[in-house]
Structures are given as C-alpha cells and as structure tokens.
Amino acid sequence: MGKAKGIRILITLECTECRSNTNKRSNGVSRYTTQKNRRNNPERIELKKYCPHCNKSTIHKEIK
C-alpha cells in the first residue's frame, strides 16, 4: 500500500514585474516559497508581496 498524497503542497511564488522590467534596483527575480491547500485552492495563487529587486510590493504568481 502506498502512502496517500498530502492535501498541503509546497509552491513557489515569483515576481511578475522582475521578469519583464529591466529598470530595477538589482539583477535577479524575487521568489518566495509557501504552502497551499490543494482542496481549497486548486487554481494558481496570486499574492501581493514585497520584492527586494523592484524595491516595492508587487504581484507574485505561483509557478511550477
């Protein structure tokens, strides 16, 4: 018997402005790791988080 998959999974959130914007404070892309409940939030998450590269709060989207 195999072990059942957990309901909570680890996800990565990436800044949407760092990908397209070249005028930023430093090079790189801001990424956060967090957990989400697969049953309550089956779609991809978008959260407003602080980006140290853009030096402001931006929308971070879930990536694979």
From Swiss-Prot:
Family: Belongs to the bacterial ribosomal protein bL33 family.
Molecular functions (GO terms): structural constituent of ribosome
Descriptive protein name: Large ribosomal subunit protein bL33c
Gene source species: Trieres chinensis (Marine centric diatom)
A single BP term in Gene Ontology: translation
Cell location: Plastid, Chloroplast
Name of the gene: rpl33
Residue pairs linked by disulfide bridges in the UniProt entry: none
SUPFAM superfamilies for the chain: Zn-binding ribosomal proteins
Major site of localization recorded for this protein: plastid
Domain of life where this protein originates: Eukaryota
Keywords: Chloroplast, Plastid, Ribonucleoprotein, Ribosomal protein
Xref: NCBIfam families: PRK00504.1 (NF001764), PRK00595.1 (NF001860), rpmG_bact (TIGR01023)
InterPro entries attached to this UniProt entry: Ribosomal_bL33 (IPR001705), Ribosomal_bL33_CS (IPR018264), Ribosomal_bL33_sf (IPR038584), Ribosomal_zn-bd (IPR011332)
PROSITE patterns hit by this protein: RIBOSOMAL_L33
One Pfam family in the UniProt entry: Ribosomal_L33
Gene Ontology cellular-component terms listed: chloroplast; ribonucleoprotein complex; ribosome
